[in-house]
Structure formats: structure tokens, C-alpha cells
């Protein structure tokens, strides 16, 4: 089965608390059981330091969001059999090019844009996974 996770955290790339450990642990176990696993996380400035080399996907998209246009690029890498997608959103709001994951006044808006960009890219590349798991309040 093909399972996609959309999450604000995934260890070791972006971790604040237990969510990051749950996502990576669950993903590793699903891969071990023979499933195909994708994990979408925002491209935080600090996330790529923990990843193997990244490659930028040829596909990109743009979408209207809250009165502005958001351009979405995605970088990918493989970590312990898990396909990691880092969603890079460009807009005047500068959603994820910040120093930390949470604690901003616009967190709800930031993560709504991240989920929208992730779903747009999943649709664009015709992944169509039968399971999309949205983790915790930022993505659910």
C-alpha cells in the first residue's frame, strides 16, 4: 500500500516534541512491512542539514491563498527507505523561512498553506495514495 504523511515534524529533520518521533517510527515500520511511504514536511531552513542530498522536483505549482499567490516547489530525498518531500512555499508571507517550527501568530495560516501546497503537489504528480495521514493540529 502507498501511504503519505503530511506533517509539521519528522525526526531528525524537524523536531520539537514526540510527533517527530512518532512520524519517523511509524514510517520506518510501514516500510519494513513492505509499504511505500512518503512524508511531506515544510522546508524549514534547518531541515536540510539532516538530510542526504536533495533533488528539486521538476514540477511546481502556484495557488491563490488569502489574497496572495503562493508558489510551491518541492525537494525530495530518501531517508531509511522513506521518501521525504520538503515543501518550499514562496509568498509575501514568508511562511516557513523562519527560525523555529511553532510559536508564530500566523501558525494556523502557515500550516493551512503547507497542507494546500502538499495536496496540490500530490495531485500534480498523480501520486493518488489510498491513505493520506494528516498529523496533529497543524495539518488536520
Walk through the language-model features, giving the residues of each.
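Short His-centered aromatic/hydrophobic patch
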Residues: 134-138
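Structural motif
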Residues: 2, 130-131
